[in-house]
């Protein structure tokens, strides 16, 4: 299992949250996607952290990033980016 973590700084937090909820199924319907969770900053309410569990980095890259679902996802949420998101993949230590 791989955890994708993406940090979004946005211009309109409420509009971004609504756009995310409308586009969330683009992620969930991807082969290899196990779970999706979006959190919103308390101290920085225009910052969001997305956590997606994937079977592998390849599942993320091949089954989502390289598809029309990714294009639809970015079309929905991209207009609210204050800057490009920061995205990394992580694995468990234990």
Task: State where each predicted segment sits.
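Glycine-rich beta-strand-turn "strand-cap" elements at beta-sheet edges
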Residues: 2, 37-49, 72-94
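Short, well-ordered beta-strand segments in beta-rich or mixed alpha/beta enzyme
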Residues: 2-9, 37-65
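Short, surface-exposed ligand-recognition loops at beta-strand->loop->(often short) alpha-helix junctions
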Residues: 9-19
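Generic structural motif
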Residues: 11-13, 57, 92
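An amphipathic, aromatic/His-enriched active-site/gating alpha helix that lines ligand/cofactor pockets
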Residues: 18-33, 53-86
């Amino acid at each position: 299992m791989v955890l994708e973590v993406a940090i979004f700084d946005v211009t309109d937090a409420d509009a971004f949250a609504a756009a995310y909820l409308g586009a969330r199924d683009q992620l969930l319907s991807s082969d290899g996607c196990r779970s999706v969770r979006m959190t919103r900053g308390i101290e920085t309410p225009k910052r969001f952290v997305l956590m997606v569990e994937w079977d592998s980095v390849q599942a993320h890259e091949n089954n989502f990033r390289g598809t029309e679902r990714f294009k639809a996802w970015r079309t929905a949420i991209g207009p609210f980016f204050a800057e490009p998101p920061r995205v990394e993949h992580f694995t468990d230590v234990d």
